[in-house]
Amino acid sequence: MADTPEVIRVAADILTKRYGGKQELVDVERLDGSGVAEVYRARVVNNPFFQHRSVVVKRSPASGDELVDAAFLRETVAYQFATSLSPSARPGPVLLGYDTAQRVLIISDLGDGRTLADALRAADEATHTDILRKLGRALGMMHAGTADEEDAFNVLLQRMTRSRPNSANLQKLRDRLLSHRIRIGVNVIEGAGVAIPAEVRIAASNVQSRLLRGGMRAFTPFDLTPDNIVETDSAFHFLDYEWAGYRDATFDVAFVVARFPAFLAAQPFNAQATEAFVDAW
């Protein structure tokens, strides 16, 4: 793992090359990151060339696994795309700089907000409904604001992968893996001796197709676990874009309604909160 000063030095150099002046990053704080990623917050020394007072620096070390390492390019493109959106549709932080060779991203600092997981854990029934309503509104604004922009996202992805051998194929393979997992899930259930009705098989087949094409397509981070959603200034922001892209937006809705099935600590939702979420979306 690179030591902290080296990662921060790289980030300062990236910002200097992009914005001019001589950027300095101090008061470095290590943050929680997903997987092997190193994530830091740093304060920016006052500089007329750069208006942000603090930034978040993320480094994703190469693992040697092509499929795993391809996530960095996807995340970079997703942040490029999200940054180009209007503030009302933008799902999360702004991309301030990056270096694909060093595998470093620099994004705006959202501050010390609480995660959706923390908010749900502390909520009573009424607050729970308000939280889900606010989440539905945030998702709906992102989906509505990006529904017609898939070509723009694809152009950015093509530019990023064009000069990198096999990179485009790896991105397509990662998308197909999501569809493949549905088939695996059906096989696992069947292997456990559970009878699968024909209607469920048909639904699973339809879902596989809608992951890759058709449906109500919009931009989504697609990893909507409550610890990847942060609330600041009374608004929700979505983090971690390693699986981001254009997919049927109803997958995001279903993921919330199903109580975040990939996040075992999620609080069960009551019917009123679920209805409020869907109505707001």
Label each PLM-derived region with a short phrase:
Residues 149, 189-195, 263-269:
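Inter-helical turn/loop segments and adjacent helix faces that build the functional surface
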Residues 36, 43-159:
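ATP-binding pocket architecture of kinase catalytic cores
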Residues 251-281:
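Active-site activation/catalytic loop segments of kinase-like enzymes and analogous catalytic loops
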Residues 1-8, 155-208:
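Active-site catalytic-loop/activation-segment of kinase and kinase-like phosphoryl-transfer enzymes
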Residues 20-26, 77, 202-214:
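Short Pro/Gly-enriched beta-strand edge/turn motifs at strand-loop
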Residues 118-127, 238-245, 259-265:
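Short helix/strand-bridging catalytic loops that position acidic/His residues to coordinate divalent metals
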Residues 31-51, 56, 203-251:
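Active-site acidic catalytic loop and adjacent metal/ATP-binding pocket
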Residues 1-30:
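Juxta-kinase regulatory segment immediately upstream of eukaryotic protein kinase catalytic domains
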